[in-house]
Amino acid sequence: MSVLYPLIQALVLFAVAPLLSGITRVARARLHNRRGPGVLQEYRDIIKLLGRQSVGPDASGWVFRLTPYVMVGVMLTIATALPVVTVGSPLPQLGDLITLLYLFAIARFFFAISGLDTGSPFTAIGASREAMLGVLVEPMLLLGLWVAAQVAGSTNISNITDTVYHWPLSQSIPLVLALCACAFATFIEMGKLPFDLAEAEQELQEGPLSEYSGSGFGVMKWGISLKQLVVLQMFVGVFIPWGQMETFTAGGLLLALVIAIVKLVVGVLVIALFENSMARLRLDITPRITWAGFGFAFLAFVSLLAA
């Protein structure tokens, strides 16, 4: 059971990831007064792509071909350790904060260098922008989660979630500021406007995707959808853990599952509302905005020292 449960959780998240992307697309269309493609359109697109031949540039190497599978594999690994219906991590051995952040860094690293491996200047520029965005957002996420870890006295995600679940009043200010910083970082990591647009594979920001086609592109799209879901679930599971089970029961599992679905759907709709109220930023303006998120993380750190 201890091995089966995290595997089932990862596979379920993998299966529903395109559905959450579909809900986002429908919400965006409704906010634009359009009908939209339907919540299952992501599945149709991916299935169609998986049935086609994957063709890459002549100059591309093994990194370009391997990256889609690395993206999916890394995100599935992270998904096994996230608290979804329980307060504790289903796989405590993998549920260390530093380990999870390194896994996210591996996925970003491969995504960036896959753009450099094509020999195309267009994808290379997109890869450099992706790397720069990572430099801006990862310190914010790391510092925010580290403050929460210091409050919990452990870097294990189960202990952090349990501490937030019981919410120590004496540490409310650091936790609230850390929550704001991580919410900011989550928004950026999910590839949303004004920083990015996850469906814009023909544009410069998503340049590394422009050379993929067929089954490779389908796997990559599924991996990006899974990354968005995993990033959102990590934030929701750690900082909004209420409704998750402390002890495993059949009735509690059903209730926790319903609450988890509601939290994810509400999160997706709130993010869609925010991103559709803003225009995309120029790259040179992006660092000025991300400083606000890092400011929340730094204030959380200072308030932790002062507490």
From Swiss-Prot:
The chain crosses the membrane at residues 3-23, 68-88, 94-114, 132-152, 168-188, 222-242, 254-274, 285-305. The keyword ATP-binding does not apply. It is a multi-pass membrane protein. One of its GO terms (cellular component) is plasma membrane. It is found in: Cell inner membrane. Belongs to the complex I subunit 1 family. This is Formate hydrogenlyase subunit 4.
